[in-house]
């Protein structure tokens, strides 16, 4: 496999890192990073059939980087060293068939950009990145982390607040980011999506103020046979359950043992209407 195009001097790649910046047990550092440089690295590795190669440092071309936003809080510039010992492998089908990631035994780690900063996304685009590549992962990540300014920027750039069955709204509600939830609703997100799952997951995670806010905006406590109440009980949040029970006098009392397995399979793509 010919990787000559990847090895062009000054060509920039990206990787996503967390805090601390450890990948596969390897502590990343600014500048040159070398890992297991004497081990054989296959030129192509199909992630559908094998586990991730443990002895590689991973990076992506700018076009695909938004596919990997959930993996951390920083965008790091990556460059490849001009070294005859450099070995590269193409990571096929990670995390899906449309994605393109590479691994190498050595990389040069460049500037760190915060994913909470809208300017980071401007830079991604400047480098050829697609903010909506294969969906709206960048928006979903920003909403989940409460990055209000980034959510605003991405929506203004064309990202869809209703993408993936309003998953951004559900994630922001689940994490208690009321300002982001308000923004998403203003931009067209549907509070009733998937049988009001923003309310159910806010209840599951014990976000009382979020629960009150969503109900004030029309979220249905009775959705799908009182799922939000069941989710509150499942999460051990009796106070939230009692608050919602007071809004449903027809139920009467419910014991703490009346819990619910909150697996997301409870929702299907066809499950979009409330069941009262």
UniProtKB/Swiss-Prot annotation:
Domain of life: Viruses
SUPFAM superfamilies in alphabetical order: Ankyrin repeat
InterPro entries noted in UniProt: Ankyrin_rpt (IPR002110), Ankyrin_rpt-contain_sf (IPR036770)
Keyword vocabulary terms for this entry: ANK repeat, Repeat
Region span, Disordered: 254-276
Gene3D superfamilies assigned: Ankyrin repeat-containing domain (1.25.40.20)
Segments annotated as ANK repeats: 134-163, 164-193, 195-223, 225-253
Name this protein carries in UniProt: Putative ankyrin repeat protein R838
Composition bias type Acidic residues, residue spans: 255-276
């Amino acid at each position: 496999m010919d990787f000559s195009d990847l090895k062009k001097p000054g060509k920039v790649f990206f990787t996503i890192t967390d805090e601390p910046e450890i990948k596969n047990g390897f502590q990343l550092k600014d500048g040159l990073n070398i890992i297991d440089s004497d081990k054989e690295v296959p030129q192509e590795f199909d992630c559908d059939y094998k586990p991730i190669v443990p002895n590689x440092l991973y990076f992506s071309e700018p076009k695909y980087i938004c596919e990997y936003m959930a993996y951390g809080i920083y965008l790091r510039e990556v460059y490849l060293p001009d070294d005859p010992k450099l070995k590269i492998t193409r990571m096929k089908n990670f995390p899906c068939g449309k994605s393109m990631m590479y691994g190498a035994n050595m990389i040069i780690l460049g500037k760190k950009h915060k994913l909470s900063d809208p300017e980071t996304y401007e830079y991604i685009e400047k480098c050829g990145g697609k903010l909506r590549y294969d969906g709206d992962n960048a928006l979903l990540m920003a909403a989940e982390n409460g990055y209000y300014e980034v959510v605003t920027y991405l929506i203004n750039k064309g990202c869809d607040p209703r993408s993936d069955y309003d998953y951004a709204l559900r994630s922001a509600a689940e994490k208690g980011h009321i300002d982001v939830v308000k923004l998403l609703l203003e931009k067209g997100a549907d509070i009733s999506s998937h049988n009001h799952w923003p309310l159910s997951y806010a209840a599951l995670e014990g976000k009382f103020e979020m629960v009150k806010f969503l109900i004030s905006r029309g979220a249905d406590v009775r959705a799908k046979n009182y799922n939000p109440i069941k989710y509150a009980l499942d999460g051990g949040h009796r106070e939230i359950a009692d608050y919602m029970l007071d809004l449903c006098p027809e139920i009467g009392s419910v014991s703490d043992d009346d819990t619910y397995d909150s697996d997301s399979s409870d929702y299907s793509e066809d499950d979009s209407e409330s069941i009262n």
